[in-house]
Regions:
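RNA-binding accessory domains that recognize and position tRNA/RNA substrates
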Residues: 1-4, 48, 69, 79, ...
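Substrate-binding N-lobe of the ribokinase-like
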Residues: 1-63
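Conserved structural-core and active-site-/substrate-pathway-adjacent residues in large, well-folded domains
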Residues: 18, 65, 105-108, 154, ...
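Short, surface-exposed connector motifs at secondary-structure boundaries
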Residues: 19-26, 100-104, 128, 182
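A structural signal for isolated positions on well-ordered beta-strands in alpha/beta enzyme cores
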Residues: 26-29, 52, 104-106, 134, ...
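Conserved phosphate-binding/catalytic loop of the ribokinase/pfkB sugar-kinase fold
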Residues: 53-59, 66-101
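Short acidic, glycine-rich surface-loop motifs adjacent to enzyme active sites
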Residues: 102-114
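Conserved phosphate/ATP/ADP-binding segment of small-molecule kinases
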Residues: 112-205
């Protein structure tokens, strides 16, 4: 091994991008209390992000390793404890605490057990306080995202929920249905190299 580089992933990557654009960002999540957490703290020290994790001593901080050789990925190793934490209640309290002074909440759901159990409560609180909630979803059940401001699936995630996209007309019909079913203000469907489609209140762009 010639070099090991630690980079923020998941919600941490979203937070870093927003911070780089000048936003005032607070990053929350459930972590272990281990070397991986300490490495993440080191990386985030170089940003203006306020990081206040809920530490669960019974789990490991998620670490996704990429083994690179000759400028290409040779292997991926994931170290994580999916759906093993019972600290979601504490995470919800912390989200509400910081949300009171926020304009926007972004939920990066990687289907690891932190977000899905509290998403509906976060959305309910946010709507009562005129705070927008944007969700980057995972999994095959979006019911807990109902009444969010925006849900942003990619093409694969969208197809898992609505079925394979046959053509543009079919995609638009399915997008409108998902937006209506979840009572969203906006649905943003990302299509990789083919761009994205925005389903808003009055139009599809």
């Amino acid at each position: 091994i010639k070099k090991i580089i630690y980079k923020p992933g998941g919600a941490s990557n979203v937070a870093q991008n927003l911070s780089a654009l000048g936003s005032n960002v607070t990053l929350l999540g459930i972590t272990g209390d281990d070397n991986e957490l300490r490495e993440l703290i080191k990386v985030l020290r170089h940003t203006d992000i306020k990081f206040d994790p809920v530490k669960d001593l019974s789990i490991r901080t998620t670490l996704k390793s990429r083994i690179i050789g000759n400028d290409q990925q040779l292997m991926r190793l994931d170290h994580e404890d999916r759906n093993k934490s019972d600290m979601q209640g504490e995470l919800l309290k912390r989200v509400i605490k910081y949300a009171k002074n926020s304009d926007l909440i972004i939920l990066s759901d990687y289907d690891k057990g932190s977000v899905k159990f509290i998403a509906a409560d976060i959305i309910s609180f946010a709507n009562k306080n005129n705070i927008k909630v944007i969700i980057d979803p995972k999994g095959t059940d979006y019911s807990m995202y109902k009444n969010a401001y925006m849900v942003k699936p990619n093409e694969l995630e969208f197809s898992m929920i609505m079925g394979k996209i046959k053509n543009k007309k079919d995609m638009i019909a399915k997008g409108k249905k998902l937006k209506k079913d979840l009572q969203l203000d906006t649905l943003l469907l990302t299509l990789g190299k083919n761009g994205m489609v925005l389903f808003s209140k009055d139009s599809v762009l």
